Every structure is written in C-alpha cells, then in structure tokens.
Amino acid sequence: MKKGEKVLLALGALLVAAGVFVGVTLGWDYSPNRYAYNDIDFTAAGTAAGECGFVSVRLSDLAVNIYSTTENTVTVAARGAKTPERVSVALDGGVLRITEKRLGLFRRLAASDDDAVIICIPEKWIGTVDAATQSGDVYASGLVSPQLTLRASSESGAVSASELKIAEIQLATTSGDLFVSTIRGGAVTASTTSGYVSLSDAKTENMSLSSVSGNIFVRNAELTGTLTLHSTSGEIDLEDVSAGSIEAGTTSGDLELNEVDTQSLAFTSTSGGISGELLHADEFGGSIHTVSGSVSGVRPKEDGARTLKIETVSGDVDIDG
C-alpha cells in the first residue's frame, strides 16, 4: 500500500472514531419520532403565587414562551431534550430567576432552534415578568391579570405578545421585529432600532411606539388616551385607528393615515410627508409641521369648529388630497 493511501485510511479512521465519540458523548438521537418536544418539568421551580412576585428571565440563544395557567403556581418547563441542562432556576427572596448556562462547543452544536423555556403565570397574579434574550424569540400569550406588568426584550430575536389583559406591556428589540395583537387594557410601550413594529386589535388607554429605521404598522386600534409614535427613517402607517390624540414625529419617515379618528393630531417631521384620510374631520384639530415633506389630503371641513395648523418650509401642501 502506498504511503498516501495509508495516510488517507488513517484520517478516515480518525474521523469515524471522532464521530462515534461525539455522538455517544452528546447522546444525539436522529430519530424524528423520538425527539423530545414534550415539556420537561423543573420541579424545583414550582412555587405558590404568593411566594413569587417577580420572574426574571435572562437567556442567550433559548426562546422563552410565557402563558397563563388556572393553577395557583408559577411553573417553569422546557421544550427540547437538552434544554434542562442549559437552564438554571432558583427562587430567591420572592424573585424567580431563570438563566441560561454557558455550554461547550459540542453541546451548542447539539442544541435545537426549537428549544425553549416555558413559563406559566397564574391568572390574577400580582407581579412583574421581565424576560430578556440575546437571540432567542420571546412570546407571551393569554396573560390575564389587572396587576401584572410584562417586560419582554431581545437583541436579535422577535418579540410577540397576544391576547393580553394586563396592567402594562413593555416590549423592546434591537434588530428583531415586534408583534402585538389582541390587547385589552393597560399601557403599551414598544420600541425597536431596526426591526419593524406591527400592532393590531388593541383597546387600551395610552400607547407609545418607536423605531429608528424600522416601519411601524397599527391596525384596528382604539385608544381613549394618546397614541405616541416616533420614527427616524421608518414609515408610520395607521389604519382603522381611533385615539383621543395622536402625537407623531419622524425625521425622514412618512405618516400614512387611513380611516383615522382623533380629536387632535400633532405631526412633526424634517423631510417626511403626511397623507391620508381622517374621520369626523369637522371635529378635528391639531398641527402639522414639516421642513421639506409634503402634506396631502389631511384637512378639516370648512365648517369645522377646530383649527388645523399646517407649516412647511419647502414641502408641497395639497389639502384636497
């Protein structure tokens, strides 16, 4: 046998041995029907609601799902066969702390994108859930408590909140997107740097949405108080929205209105334009100021009792739309 062939055979044998070693060490299982999608309970994390008033979640790659439960116990579970090994859960002075352990290279390779920590919060629970990840998604659904505050954030993961009836919602991402739907009551604050914000089916008092470069979309929202919107270069699009007042500001992003009902609109922009349709325009008042952006189709009726003030330096104004 030639020397080159011996070298190739030796390398092949080493690769096979390494594969067997890694597979056995990590316990990989490639059988789809045996992959662990069922929850794995952290029995030590079950604690009566009265003993826990703050849930702190700090994760890196793992996703976190937050749900409601009729039980009187805050519980933590996991999805994924290796997830329990990646998570530390401790109750300290009324604070339930959930953190992600630093894994070695081989264990990180064995992890699945579907792995997640699952937290169940009792109905009418009094306290705060503060969940933050680096790249994992955050999803909260079905929470019902007039004295519950939800704070959810991620650097690059998406943050989603749906079917919530709680006191306050605070959402934030750096590059991940924000999704909010079916919100009842409570103040809503959502901010992102480069992700986009999508909100639909909301009935609440006050709401504040902001983005640097991502777009903001609001659909089917009813506010008794103020809707505050801010974007640097992203677009702001409102459809079927009613609010006591709307305060919007952009640097270069446009504001588009479609079936928007409000008593007062204040829009300020450097080069962004504003256009669209306002309902009950005879009762509408406010101010629009832009340096070079255009104003189109936004106007009160001639017999309106309130005043709309429009200012622009070099932008066009077309109040006939």
Language-model-detected regions and their locations in the chain:
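Short linear S-[DN]-x-LW-Φ motif typified by the pepsin-like aspartic protease active-site region
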Residues: L26-K101, R108-S153, A158-E163, E168, ...
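Short, surface-exposed interaction patches in beta-rich subdomains
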Residues: L143, V159-L164, E168-I169, L178-G321
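Hydrophobic membrane-insertion alpha-helices, especially the h-region
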Residues: L8-T25
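Positively charged n-region of N-terminal signal peptides that target proteins for export
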Residues: M1-K6
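Extracellular repeat turn/loop positions enriched in glycine and acidic/polar residues, especially those
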Residues: P122, A132, S153, A172, ...
